[in-house]
């Protein structure tokens, strides 16, 4: 299995995140990438390549032109106002307010953001494009005949909607990869999101389509970010009715219960019979993750990697979350080695 990665991820390095009423060091940090690379080397998965140039036309199939323009100019507009800190939204278009994009940067940030924890810095746009290029390049490896590949994306992407950023995400790498598979001849693609947090952005992008099935195992939205999507009655709309499947699970969920949901998802994927499978790989289901509440052990990640392999489908792993930094390498690579041994 080849890994695609880029050290340009370091260009996105926010210094602060609002959590618990305090400004803290962001949980989504460059060290996450370092620990994963180190563990890949330790187990011998050292076949790595840099991404090719990003095909922006592919990104434009996933995100709206206005949103992409905003991301490309947000930092320059913010800094032109003389602000010294990172660009963080402070006002949002709440219920019964106009859904019109303002001109002033503070309003634009709130218009496109879903939460306050995700800062834009001087290098965010470049890092987000590089992360998308990592996903695109890995997708092309699989489209060209590789049985599997790992896109070590940072920043992550599954919370980014067609015109929405937040949850540490700017461009939806998994959705870009799924769209790339379709462009390369796939008739159907499944996206399985095993991150602790619901992949609201991916659901948003494909909700009315039947050529991409989206399935997500996540903390119940009553208790877990992003709170406002991820319920079982969200099953798709129009042409996409029946092709969106959510598995919200309660606080304290152990692996046995989580794995039952995974088995059901895998059965649905097998019945759908996609030409390619994208795994939104978040390992924040780990018991010691600081912003999650599932109880998976490190060995459990190996076990479910094997279960995914039993589908025997061309499979692309796209890195998402995981914030127990010292264990992120072990847990991520356990999924990959479990898959390869399956």
State where each predicted segment sits.
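HDAC/HDAC-like amidohydrolase catalytic core signature
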Residues: 1-192, 197-342
């Amino acid at each position: 299995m080849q890994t695609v990665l880029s050290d340009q991820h370091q260009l996105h390095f926010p210094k602060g995140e609002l959590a618990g009423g305090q400004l803290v060091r962001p949980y989504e940090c460059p060290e996450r990438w370092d620990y994963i690379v180190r563990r890949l080397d330790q187990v011998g998965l050292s076949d790595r390549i840099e991404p090719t140039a990003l095909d922006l036309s592919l990104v434009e199939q996933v995100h709206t032109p206005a949103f992409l323009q905003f991301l490309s100019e947000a930092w320059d507009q913010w800094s032109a106002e003389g602000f010294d800190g990172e660009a963080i939204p402070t006002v949002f278009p709440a219920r019964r307010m106009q859904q019109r994009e303002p001109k002033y940067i503070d309003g634009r940030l709130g218009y496109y953001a879903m939460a306050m924890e995700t800062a834009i810095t001087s290098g965010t746009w470049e890092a987000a494009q590089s992360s998308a290029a990592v996903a695109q390049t890995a997708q092309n490896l699989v489209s060209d005949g590789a049985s599997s590949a790992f896109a070590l994306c940072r920043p992550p992407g599954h919370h980014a909607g067609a015109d929405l950023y937040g949850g540490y995400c700017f461009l939806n790498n998994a959705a870009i990869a799924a769209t790339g598979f379709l462009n390369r001849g796939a008739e159907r693609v499944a996206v399985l999101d095993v991150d602790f947090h619901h992949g609201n952005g991916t659901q948003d992008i494909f909700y009315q389509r039947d050529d991409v099935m989206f399935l997500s195992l996540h903390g119940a939205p009553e208790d877990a970010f992003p709170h406002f999507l991820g319920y079982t009655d969200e099953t798709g709309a129009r042409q996409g009715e029946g092709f969106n499947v959510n598995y919200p699970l309660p606080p304290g969920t152990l692996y046995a219960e989580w794995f039952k949901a995974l088995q059901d998802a895998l059965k649905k994927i097998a019945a759908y019979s996609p030409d390619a499978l994208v795994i939104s790989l978040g390992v924040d289901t780990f018991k010691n993750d600081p912003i999650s509440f599932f109880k998976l052990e490190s060995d459990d990640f190996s076990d479910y990697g094997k279960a995914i392999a039993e589908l025997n489908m061309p499979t692309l792993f796209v890195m998402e979350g995981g914030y127990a930094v010292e264990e992120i390498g072990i847990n991520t690579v356990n999924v990959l080695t479990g898959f390869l041994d399956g």
